[in-house]
Amino acid sequence: MINIRKTHPLMKIVNNAFIDLPAPSNISSWWNFGSLLGICLILQILTGLFLAMHYTADTATAFHSVTHICRDVNYGWIIRYMHANGASMFFICLFMHVGRGLYYGSYTFLETWNIGVILLFATMATAFMGYVLPWGQMSFWGATVITNLLSAIPYIGTDLVEWIWGGFSVDKATLTRFFAFHFILPFIIAALAMVHLLFLHETGSNNPTGIPSDSDKIPFHPYYTIKDILGALLLILILMLLVLFSPDLLGDPDNYTPANPLNTPPHIKPEWYFLFAYAILRSIPNKLGGVLALVLSILILVLMPLLHTSKQRSMMFRPISQCLFWVLVADLLTLTWIGGQPVEYPYITIGQLASIMYFLLILVLMPVASTIENNLLKWK
């Protein structure tokens, strides 16, 4: 009898993607983050769905509906904090996943990589809009500051901002549309993730060496399914430790104050996972320049395949590039720290230096290091 999983039209797709998929025999735990991102997305959609059942997207009642969820809804508090901290876990996995791609040269799979960059943008947009929904002080002022950046676009900027706001300031119309977009975007992300996987399975996975592994493949199940389950258990453990012991650790105390357009918080800052980009934005005195730098700090990932000058794909055997990669990681951590600090000396200077270093590393130093490594190996 022919196995049903290999013949049934639907089961066949699942089988080819998760069971009989030929996978390299040497992929490390850095390859776990793809499945962890899938779990994060499912978790966010499910918790978000239950939150949406009790939330009201109206400026008069939004803040109180979130309070109601936490106080009156059965297990509402755990759903709310799983959703809020789930977003943090999502971004930790995202940054690890992108970092893995940079380190091991996975960006040479062009379609997979570019869809990944679109996924990153979509996830950032979703998270930003989600942060606005509780309608606390930081929600309101974060939305005001970030949407206002679009006014830097020449000629159409002001009209564009008012169009997004649905009026002359962040108000009821803005909150309603942000809720609508925040609800629909995760499903678009899920669809894009499927396309991401589709293109990945056209080429097969990369591996730590960066050398083609067609001669040494193993089935995905049971080897990597069990490995992914371990990763998932660790992810859920860390998430639940965060949710049950310090649910507000990564949040902002200002968001426990209802939004007040007449009172500006002393330090307006986004969630921690946007701080690196926010620091780059703030480090440039010109508004349009700052906005361009902000967009380019993420869009620069699209250029990675063009900036790859090495004859080797992975950084596994390239010590100079490895050092620069970890300098880049340290630089991003510095930017994250600076983004949360007030705009004053010495933070301004550190932020400017870290921003220059970020673009310099990616655009100049890493390609030059790769060329030097080629010459050292006499691979001209």
From Swiss-Prot:
<dbReference type="Pfam" id="PF00033">
    <property type="entry name" value="Cytochrome_B"/>
</dbReference>
<dbReference type="InterPro" id="IPR048260">
    <property type="entry name" value="Cytochrome_b_C_euk/bac"/>
</dbReference>
<keyword id="KW-0479">Metal-binding</keyword>
<feature type="binding site" description="axial binding residue">
    <location>
        <position position="182"/>
    </location>
    <ligand>
        <name>heme b b562</name>
    </ligand>
</feature>
<dbReference type="InterPro" id="IPR048259">
    <property type="entry name" value="Cytochrome_b_N_euk/bac"/>
</dbReference>
<keyword id="KW-0813">Transport</keyword>
<dbReference type="GO" id="GO:0008121">
    <property type="term" value="F:ubiquinol-cytochrome-c reductase activity"/>
</dbReference>
<keyword id="KW-0679">Respiratory chain</keyword>
<feature type="transmembrane region" description="Helical">
    <location>
        <begin position="178"/>
        <end position="198"/>
    </location>
</feature>
<comment type="function">
    <text>Component of the ubiquinol-cytochrome c reductase complex (complex III or cytochrome b-c1 complex) that is part of the mitochondrial respiratory chain. The b-c1 complex mediates electron transfer from ubiquinol to cytochrome c. Contributes to the generation of a proton gradient across the mitochondrial membrane that is then used for ATP synthesis.</text>
</comment>
<keyword id="KW-0249">Electron transport</keyword>
<dbReference type="InterPro" id="IPR005798">
    <property type="entry name" value="Cyt_b/b6_C"/>
</dbReference>
<dbReference type="GO" id="GO:0046872">
    <property type="term" value="F:metal ion binding"/>
</dbReference>
<feature type="transmembrane region" description="Helical">
    <location>
        <begin position="113"/>
        <end position="133"/>
    </location>
</feature>
<feature type="binding site">
    <location>
        <position position="201"/>
    </location>
    <ligand>
        <name>a ubiquinone</name>
    </ligand>
</feature>
<dbReference type="GO" id="GO:0006122">
    <property type="term" value="P:mitochondrial electron transport, ubiquinol to cytochrome c"/>
</dbReference>
<dbReference type="InterPro" id="IPR030689">
    <property type="entry name" value="Cytochrome_b"/>
</dbReference>
<keyword id="KW-0472">Membrane</keyword>
<keyword id="KW-0830">Ubiquinone</keyword>
<keyword id="KW-0496">Mitochondrion</keyword>
<comment type="subunit">
    <text>The cytochrome bc1 complex contains 11 subunits: 3 respiratory subunits (MT-CYB, CYC1 and UQCRFS1), 2 core proteins (UQCRC1 and UQCRC2) and 6 low-molecular weight proteins (UQCRH/QCR6, UQCRB/QCR7, UQCRQ/QCR8, UQCR10/QCR9, UQCR11/QCR10 and a cleavage product of UQCRFS1). This cytochrome bc1 complex then forms a dimer.</text>
</comment>
<feature type="binding site" description="axial binding residue">
    <location>
        <position position="83"/>
    </location>
    <ligand>
        <name>heme b b562</name>
    </ligand>
</feature>
<feature type="transmembrane region" description="Helical">
    <location>
        <begin position="320"/>
        <end position="340"/>
    </location>
</feature>
<dbReference type="Pfam" id="PF00032">
    <property type="entry name" value="Cytochrom_B_C"/>
</dbReference>
<dbReference type="InterPro" id="IPR027387">
    <property type="entry name" value="Cytb/b6-like_sf"/>
</dbReference>
<keyword id="KW-0408">Iron</keyword>
<dbReference type="GO" id="GO:0045275">
    <property type="term" value="C:respiratory chain complex III"/>
</dbReference>
<feature type="transmembrane region" description="Helical">
    <location>
        <begin position="77"/>
        <end position="98"/>
    </location>
</feature>
<dbReference type="InterPro" id="IPR016174">
    <property type="entry name" value="Di-haem_cyt_TM"/>
</dbReference>
<dbReference type="InterPro" id="IPR036150">
    <property type="entry name" value="Cyt_b/b6_C_sf"/>
</dbReference>
<protein>
    <recommendedName>
        <fullName>Cytochrome b</fullName>
    </recommendedName>
</protein>
<keyword id="KW-0812">Transmembrane</keyword>
<keyword id="KW-0999">Mitochondrion inner membrane</keyword>
<dbReference type="GO" id="GO:0005743">
    <property type="term" value="C:mitochondrial inner membrane"/>
</dbReference>
<feature type="transmembrane region" description="Helical">
    <location>
        <begin position="33"/>
        <end position="53"/>
    </location>
</feature>
<dbReference type="InterPro" id="IPR005797">
    <property type="entry name" value="Cyt_b/b6_N"/>
</dbReference>
<keyword id="KW-0349">Heme</keyword>
<comment type="similarity">
    <text>Belongs to the cytochrome b family.</text>
</comment>
<feature type="binding site" description="axial binding residue">
    <location>
        <position position="97"/>
    </location>
    <ligand>
        <name>heme b b566</name>
    </ligand>
</feature>
<feature type="binding site" description="axial binding residue">
    <location>
        <position position="196"/>
    </location>
    <ligand>
        <name>heme b b566</name>
    </ligand>
</feature>
<feature type="transmembrane region" description="Helical">
    <location>
        <begin position="226"/>
        <end position="246"/>
    </location>
</feature>
<feature type="transmembrane region" description="Helical">
    <location>
        <begin position="347"/>
        <end position="367"/>
    </location>
</feature>
